[in-house]
Amino acid sequence: MLLSDRDLRAEISSGRLGIDPFDDTLVQPSSIDVRLDCLFRVFNNTRYTHIDPAKQQDELTSLVQPVDGEPFVLHPGEFVLGSTLELFTLPDNLAGRLEGKSSLGRLGLLTHSTAGFIDPGFSGHITLELSNVANLPITLWPGMKIGQLCMLRLTSPSEHPYGSSRAGSKYQGQRGPTPSRSYQNFIRST
């Protein structure tokens, strides 16, 4: 069941759904707008000949921060990681779904490639997979509304929520844009 603005405010007021910093003006009829933080991870195209999800490639990305007050410029065809300004803490009976903003999508900005689902129990900043599919550069301003988070109530609380020892929670507690950790549980078929 998708939560309404009333349900979202009730979950936040009760302390079950944590959002820091929280701004009530960001609550929409059935979602919460999320804002862009000021840190980005850009890919180092000269360090590796290819990306291998089975290997730890520590120098695949570099953390960058625009000069105070300046935007990050995302060029056509580029892909970078960003993150939400807000830190989210989900209870064991709520899951999240990150969606883009329609106005930004109409400019050619994709907010996530595939990872729009947030498990119950997750706590941290949400990493954004930002792509420019337009034919002009797009300026990304820290603090701008970048997406919206919908919350879904589970039919029962999760038995092993994200962050529990059985969940394999490699991104629990992440701060800022976090690079892939696919190598940690990569399985090769024989």
From Swiss-Prot:
Pathway membership: Pyrimidine metabolism; dUMP biosynthesis; dUMP from dCTP: step 1/1
Biological process annotations from GO: dUMP biosynthetic process; dUTP biosynthetic process; nucleobase-containing small molecule interconversion
Signal sequence, renumbered to the chain: none
The EC number(s) this enzyme carries: 3.5.4.30
Positions annotated to bind dCTP: K101, S102, S103, L104, G105, R106, D119, T127, L128, E129, Q148, Y162, K170, Q174
Gene Ontology MF terms: dCTP deaminase (dUMP-forming) activity; dCTP deaminase activity; dUTP diphosphatase activity; nucleotide binding
Swiss-Prot/TrEMBL keywords: Hydrolase, Nucleotide metabolism, Nucleotide-binding
Catalytic residues of the enzyme: E129 (proton donor/acceptor)
Catalysis performed (reactions): dCTP + 2 H2O = dUMP + NH4(+) + diphosphate
Marked site positions, Important for bifunctional activity: G116, F117
Activity regulation, free text: dTTP inhibits both the combined reaction and the dUTPase reaction.
Lyase among keywords: no
SUPFAM superfamilies, per the entry: dUTPase-like (SSF51283)
Domain of life, per lineage: Bacteria
Residue segments, region Disordered: 160-190
Top-level EC class as recorded in UniProt: hydrolase
Biased composition (Polar residues): 171-190
Pfam family, one: DCD
Protein family: Belongs to the dCTP deaminase family.
Function: Bifunctional enzyme that catalyzes both the deamination of dCTP to dUTP and the hydrolysis of dUTP to dUMP without releasing the toxic dUTP intermediate. It also acts as a dUTP diphosphatase. Affinity for dCTP and dUTP are very similar.
Subunit structure: Homotrimer.
Full protein name: dCTP deaminase, dUMP-forming
Organism: Mycobacterium tuberculosis (strain ATCC 25618 / H37Rv)
Encoding gene (name): dcd
